[in-house]
Amino acid sequence: MAEPSFARLFLLFFSFLLIFATYSWVFGPDSGFLFGTRVRKTLGSNRQVHVDHSLEKPHHPLDPLTVREINRVRTILSNHDPGFGSGSATIHSMALDEPEKSRVVQWKKGNKLLSRRAAVVAYWGGQTHEITVDLDSGRVVSDVINRTSGYPILTLNDVFAASQVPLKSLEFNRSIEARGVKFSDLACITPFAGWFGSEEEGRRVIRVQCFTLQGTTNYFMRPLEGLYVTVDLDKLEVIKIIDKGPIPIPKASGTEYRFGVQNKPVHMDRINPISMEQPDGPSFRVEDGHLVKWANWVFHVKADQRAGMIISQATVRDSETGEPRSVMYKGFPSELFVPYMDPEEGWYYKGYMDAGELGLGPTAMPLVPLNDCPRNSYYIDGVFASPDGKPIVQPNMICLFERYAGDISWRHSEILFANADIRESRPKVTLVARMATSVGNYDYIFDWEFQTDGLIRVTVAASGMLMVKGTPYDNVDDLGDREDDAGPLISENVIGVVHDHFITFHLDMDIDGPMNNSLVKVHLEKQRVPTGKSPRKSYLKVKKYIAKTEKDAQIKLSLYDPYEFHIVNPNRKSRVGNPAGYRIVPGGNAASLLDHDDPPQIRGAFTNNQIWVTPYNRSEQYAGGVLIYQSQGDDTLQVWSDRDRSIENKDIVLWYTLGFHHVPCQEDYPVMPTVAASFELKPANFFESNPILGSAPFFEKDLPVCRPFASS
């Protein structure tokens, strides 16, 4: 057999293409870039200025590392260990080592900036190093080997290098030829390894699955089913190849998703472009790149390699006094768990931990103005470190915009009194902070939405394409009693594999301060009415219980045993004596149905409950643990919570998992409609009355003149 050199060149090109699509690599001043960073072009906003990241300085204790700081960390690390200079040491993450929470809370604008440190996770010599770099002194203050199970977050270099390894194997190349696939059409991706026992312990491994690009960009719909490769990530060599023989490759026809190459007739009337106009400009402002001020809200927002986007120090102005009052110190998606429901070879290991295994930041593509974000949006870049420690930029990774969709925040008309003509209504205008990440076939859109009544709504929307399985069958009638357990047939030779999505959020609630918060479980209990006392037979009574320890706060939601869950500050009372609080309001949700001793569920044990409360611990940030790749579940939220520490009247963290089961159908093929799930953080006796009374209605005179009618 001839050496498939063209295929290797193609995969190399394909890998670099993905790198350039993901990262904003830059090479010189002529391109408008400097020091490996990008000068952002203004998109979607007339008031947004260009940002030269090479000149940025931190202004707030929680501001992310700047380009200058990342370059300085790289220099310090090179002096600390020759591995960083030679390239044998790989940086898997570099982020701000946030100052102690108490110091951040006390800091005020105008004060001297707190000490800046960088937290680095690096890998070399088969060991994971957690390194702290003091930027003020220019030295490494700690270098500790993490000996827990698991490995650090993958780099895209890991992923792209592993995808090329199978081409070194003669057996693999023969399998590709046997399937009639040209090497020039080959596209290989790297589903993560999971953890399934001793065979894979002691070395970093990854799976490789291949598809064909022939006839479509949507290669996810054309899997080379039955061919599975396991690769040693450190040695970059094939460990195992499983070839079950050729299975029919699904057709390319009808799978292309790019708008410019669609050739099918569209049987719907065209929708005219829609835009929300703001003649006076947006109502929010962004100070120093990260501090957002809008209506009665102030919060800090930044991009993060692992979490994607972090909201910090969210405060809302009191509607009676104007006092800024703290609501949440820090909120972010801590982990995404996506287990697939196919126990067969080639699929059983697919139980992704997207945040901890690959990161939501590096996979966040630039948001598309007018389609991802509306007019008058403000864009924020992400600044991260590459595996060799050089700064890189994810342009337009986060957008901020005001949303008005014709919704009503409050209304009332009075009709009971003669001569009364009372019609009061307030439009619902909200502020949204958004980011989107493309993790393989799935895209996730994260929205943090702030309302003037003090409510925060968090929404996660899933989009993109399914991960499908090839099958010999092209009609359900051919299956007979052999219906595939993995999922339904959604197109010829295509099984939509059943799977779950679980997103666990870290919500460090600070209701009127970081200390003295408690969880109150508000139980709705059915009461029987004594015979003869009333025509009614039953009613609901509210009973409140304060959670004393962590196990009191391990909560499974139930429609038939309803609770509300309030985080309160018992030391801050309203004028009628109620403790100030916020409650978490779950939306539609789903629970994991996997056995607790199933390896994916051991690692994803943070989904065993929908709500948890733990005492604040700055080392407990990630629900699946710091090192989650091939981890064994020994450092999860479940493990921490089982210590059963006290949580009453303390600085506490609320954890909430939203989820949904996904049984695919034909409408999910070849691309999926966006599906969203959400929850709310809602004031509960926090204000003396509804702040919405202070919002103003819209008037025609304040708006631009537009054509107000549609054709009849």
Curated annotation (Swiss-Prot):
The active site is at 354 (proton acceptor), 442 (schiff-base intermediate with substrate). Copper amine oxidase that can use putrescine and spermidine as substrates. Required for abscisic acid- (ABA) and polyamine- (PA) and H(2)O(2)-dependent induced nitric oxide (NO) biosynthesis. Involved in ABA signal transduction and in responses to osmotic stress. Binds 1 copper ion per subunit. Can also use zinc ion as cofactor. GO terms for molecular function: aliphatic amine oxidase activity; copper ion binding; primary methylamine oxidase activity; quinone binding. Its EC number is 1.4.3.21. Topaquinone (TPQ) is generated by copper-dependent autoxidation of a specific tyrosyl residue. Mn(2+) binds at residues 508-510, 651-652. It catalyses: a primary methyl amine + O2 + H2O = an aldehyde + H2O2 + NH4(+). It is found in: Secreted, Extracellular space, Apoplast. This is Amine oxidase [copper-containing] gamma 1. It holds the Pfam family Cu_amine_oxid. Cu cation binds at residues 499, 501, 662. Homodimer. The modification 2',4',5'-topaquinone is found at residue 442. It comes from Arabidopsis thaliana. Pathway: Amine and polyamine degradation; putrescine degradation. Gene3D superfamilies: 3.10.450.40, Copper amine oxidase, catalytic domain. Belongs to the copper/topaquinone oxidase family. Its cofactor is Cu cation; Zn(2+); L-topaquinone; Mn(2+).
